Amino acid sequence: MNDLHVSDSVRYIGADDTTIDLFESQYPVPNGVSYNSYLILDEKAAVMDTVDRRAADKWLENMDAQLQGRAPDYLVIQHLEPDHAGSIGLLLEKFPAMELVGNAKTFSMLPKYFPGDWSSRSVTVKEGDALSLGAHTLTFVMAPMVHWPEVMVSYESSEKILFSADGFGTFGALASGESWDAEAARYYFNIVGKYGVQVQALLKKAAGLDIQTICPLHGPVLREDLGHYLGKYDLWSRYEPEEPESVLLAYASIHGNTAQAARKMKDILEQKGCPRVAFIDLCRQDQAIAVEEAFRCGRAVFMSPTYDGGLFPAMDHFMAHLRDKTWRKRKAALIENGSWAPAAAKVMRGYLEAMKDISLCPTVHTIQGAVKDCDAAAMEQIAAELLS
């Protein structure tokens, strides 16, 4: 049996994409990404999701090799986002007798991507409904807004497999050999992270299932130590930091002065015993990593110059991203730079005050141009407040 296959009856038919540069046209994926799809072979054959059109040829080749002349009876649509549903049209045309399995929201959205009346080929399921394939039975669990409204997951009871849609996914092509942990946090916080309440609801449903294997739509099939992965998702979706004592130091700098101040602040934090400072240049590093670190660390320092009477764009973009991903339950400090009419701290404060459960250090310091000896005392005070 192919190492990628889940079992003799559940076959992996997905495909790697190693030429993609930006996932969702915004997240760098230097090691590519996998579009996972699975085939259950029983008295009835069911395809679990399709793949992005970018990988359709390889996917169809893999599928045909496993079907060996059979036609699938069902296509289960767990998620309509184009990286998983982009090849539905190809399958509808290739197998005219195949039926589509989805929920009411699935079928209300489907014509937006694949115009036409598919009602005669649609099997609508709701929470708890089961679909027998023979020895295998799929039970459907609704997972709205993890991370689209139509999302559902499927539990196969005979082999105790959870087909988890985007849940438990990660970046990286399978051929890269990366572990799940290498990119799972960056994937979660940037793709799913906003929807912690909905992830918690799904985890509560999953707790009632005997799960031995998790089959996500991106990344490796998870077979061992499932408590590790479930525990990570529980922690992340409760917005609790993995490293409560660590500090994200995120800065933007125009001509290097704020960068110099950031290096000084990093030294001060480390001298005061901070176990780890995640030091991120927002102008030059992947902001998705900065978002990941913001959620991993229990504390954060934001350092930015004033620009056009407001906040420098790199910092503005980052703080908007944190707001949109519902960053919360953290302690934060602000340092601005402005030679005249400094305004960066006011804008940053506005972002933070709009977030939930953010404790802001009382000292906010303004650097005027180059960092000077007189700035050190204020930075020492901010570090003490942040680490207390």
Predicted segment positions?
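Conserved beta-strand hairpin/beta-sheet module of binuclear metal-dependent hydrolase folds
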Residues: D3-D64, V153-E156, K160-S164, T258
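FMN-binding flavodoxin-like domain, especially the glycine-rich phosphate-binding loop
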Residues: L174-I214, H218-V221, K264-I280, A290-S388
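Active-site-proximal loop/helix segment associated with metal-binding centers of metalloenzymes
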Residues: H147, V151, G167-K194, S237-E242
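Metallo-beta-lactamase
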Residues: L4-D8, G102-V151, Y195-L203
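Short N-terminal or domain-adjacent regulatory/targeting segments
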Residues: C215-E243, H317
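Structural motif
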Residues: K44-A46, Y74, H136, K160-F163, ...
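Active-site metal-binding motif and surrounding structural segment of the metallo-beta-lactamase
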Residues: E43, R54-V101
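Active-site neighborhood of phospho(di)ester-bond hydrolases with catalytic His/Asp-centered motifs
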Residues: M48-T50, P72-L80, L100-N103, L162-A165, ...
